[in-house]
């Protein structure tokens, strides 16, 4: 009887750690801003997803998830068996949102999307976008003038 309880506990533990399956052709991407873009002030980030659907957190339907936007963080550092954190570097969009407006301080920043399942965990295989690097420019900082060519002299 004791071994039966141990086996049941082991199965339940493995089920709790199991990741939700995602189609192998799922593609998560950032529509805007573009990689390398220079941005002034608050800006919109638009999320894109192919071959899966976007839903609210907690929805256990197959092939759907919700977005998490990583700001100056790397998806490689996430624990696949734990919920994706929710903090200023890991923004959670559990209402099924597909865009957000960010206001970041001047400087270089990275943005990366991760699709979370009903329990805010990473899918298997992971559905993660490429990183986008942007530079937020202070609107008060004057731009350097471009070098002007001298007009050719006529003879």
Q: Model segments located where?
A:
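A beta-strand/beta-hairpin structural motif
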Residues: 80-102
């Amino acid at each position: 009887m004791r071994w039966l309880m141990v086996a049941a506990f082991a199965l339940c533990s493995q089920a709790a750690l199991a990741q939700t399956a995602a189609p192998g052709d799922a593609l998560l991407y950032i529509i805007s801003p573009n990689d390398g873009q220079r941005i002034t002030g608050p800006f919109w980030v638009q999320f894109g997803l192919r071959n899966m659907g976007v839903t609210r957190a907690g929805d256990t339907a197959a092939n759907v998830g919700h977005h998490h936007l990583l700001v100056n963080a790397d998806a490689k550092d996430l624990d696949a068996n734990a919920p994706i954190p929710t903090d200023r570097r890991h923004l959670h969009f559990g209402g099924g949102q597909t865009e957000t407006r960010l206001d970041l301080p001047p400087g270089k920043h990275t943005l990366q999307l991760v699709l979370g399942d009903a329990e805010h965990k990473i899918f298997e295989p992971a559905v993660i976008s490429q990183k986008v690097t942007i530079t937020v420019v202070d609107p008060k900082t004057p731009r350097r003038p471009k070098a002007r060519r001298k007009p050719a002299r006529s003879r």
